[in-house]
Swiss-Prot record:
It is a multi-pass membrane protein. GO terms for molecular function: transmembrane transporter activity. This is Uncharacterized MFS-type transporter MT3072. Residues 417-445 are annotated as: Disordered. The chain crosses the membrane at residues 16-36, 52-72, 98-118, 168-188, 219-239, 243-263, 283-303, 366-386. Keywords: Cell membrane, Membrane, Transmembrane, Transmembrane helix, Transport. The keyword Transmembrane helix applies.
Length: 445
């Protein structure tokens, strides 16, 4: 690949390579959850213990995310993605080579430590190569890496695991090896001024004197819990709770993750259109909470809607990540975005690591509906934390235009400004606007 990829096609090609590399890291991080049925059936491993094993890559991520972010700000995306993928592959091969669950957990933890840089590097890469009016769409496409990685794991790992845990772990090992090669050949760092030429203001910490980033971190961490819980327990819920086969459950998990991938692209484009990353995040949080509460209400009641609600929450739960990553890179700037994304991913992974063992124990003692209800509290708590007034640099005019359109539409609705309908008088001195035609006012899009 050319080392000066200024063309549109070259930028998108780099983004696609970044997507594949990041998908491989999420395959490793989340793929262990698809070994749970094998661990339960072949080894008699309790669900709480299997959930703890599935969380080990996330615990490894927590340890190194900020360090990877610091390294990213200083050496660039290509180096971080290549080295991280290679080390993750080595850990996956090591985990596949041992029989003891203790040693498998150790190597999964080490692999999680190695995988921490890929997600931050991929987000920073997109922010560097794409202008503001395309960044939401590009970040949304790049963020399909997580559901695509999980979908590939759901489709392949359960079938391989029928031959043993070793066979299931070999799949992420091979994929991460290919990702390391792709990083070396296909990733090009975006052009940036050197740190020595940057102004003092550009190098200043974006956390100083502002709570914006901390609010984004807190909201995204809370929104991580529904994602973690559904990814970890959807497969085993379908098998044990509904009597599905491993193959049937794996296919449905794959379909839900593919729908989530398409949803991430759609909400990224939506954020470009409305000129805001955070307004969609608040709506996603509210929708996630409502869906989980509905699932808690109908589960165990013999309803035919519980599987549909599970698909819905598994899609909704993955929609927000790209929007938050785009907002962080835009607000933090090129010299702090690596560390800011490192902190962001650390807070998310703390939730991702804590979720499987805690909710595994809760499901064992109190059944699934209680777990869904408790999980719904997390996105509900995120709603007031989302900084909806934060506007992306370069899209302020578009955001204001959308706000004016919404304001005018709501004024019309509140004043019953419909054709042939009663109208409330406006403020003194305000000219009365005459509408013609018989079509009702439609809300702005």
């Amino acid at each position: 690949m050319s080392r000066d990829p200024t063309g549109v096609g070259a930028r998108w090609a780099i983004m696609i390579v970044s997507l594949g590399v990041t998908a491989s890291s999420f395959l490793f991080i989340n793929g262990v959850a698809f070994l749970i049925p094998r661990l339960e059936n072949a080894r008699g491993t309790p669900l709480s213990h299997a959930g703890l094993l599935a969380s080990m890559p996330s615990w490894g991520l927590v340890v190194t995310m900020f360090a990877w972010g610091y390294l990213l700000d200083h050496v660039g995306e290509r180096m971080v993605m290549a080295v991280g993928s290679a080390l993750t592959a080595a850990a996956a091969y090591a985990a596949a080579s041992v029989h003891s669950l203790l040693w498998i957990g150790v190597f999964l933890f080490l692999g999680g430590m190695a995988a921490g840089g890929c997600n931050s590097a991929g987000g920073r890469l997109v922010s560097g190569w794409f202008p503001p009016q395309q960044r939401g769409l590009a970040m949304g496409i790049r963020q399909t890496a997580q559901p695509l990685g999980i979908a590939s794991g759901a489709l392949v790992i359960p079938e391989l695991a029928e031959r043993g845990v070793h066979a299931g772990l070999m799949f992420p090992a091979v994929v991460c090896t290919l990702a390391a090669v792709a990083s070396v050949l296909g990733i090009v760092d975006p052009p940036r001024k050197s740190r020595t030429k940057a102004s003092e203001q550009e190098l200043a910490s974006p956390y100083r004197g502002s709570s914006i980033l901390w609010r984004i971190h807190a909201a995204s961490a809370l929104l991580m819990m529904p994602q973690t819980v559904t990814v970890t327990f959807m497969l085993v819920w379908l098998i044990n709770h509904h009597g599905w086969s491993v193959a049937q459950a794996g296919v449905l998990v794959t379909i839900s993750q593919l729908l989530g991938a398409l949803g991430r692209v759609a909400v990224g484009r939506w954020s470009d259109h409305v000129g805001s990353r955070m307004r969609p995040v608040r709506l996603i949080a509210a929708a996630a909470a409502a869906t989980l509460f509905l699932l808690a209400a109908v589960d165990n009641e013999g309803s035919r809607y519980d599987v549909l609600l599970m698909i819905a929450i598994s899609v909704i739960a993955v929609l927000d990540n790209g929007l938050e990553a785009a907002a962080i890179t835009e607000y933090a700037g090129p010299y702090w975005s690596g560390r800011a994304l490192g902190i962001q991913n650390t807070t998310q992974r703390l939730m991702a690591a804590a979720g499987p063992p805690l909710f595994g124990s809760l499901i064992t003692t109190a059944a699934y509906p209680t777990a869904w209800a408790l999980c719904g509290v997390f996105p509900l708590a995120a709603v007031p934390l989302v900084p909806v007034r934060l506007l992306p640099p370069g899209l302020e005019t578009r955001a204001r235009r959308q706000s004016v359109r919404r304001h005018r539409w709501w004024q019309a609705v509140r004043c019953h400004a419909w054709p042939n309908g009663p109208r409330r008088p406006g403020p003194p001195g305000q000219p009365r606007r005459v509408r013609q035609g018989g079509t009702a006012i439609t809300p702005p899009t």
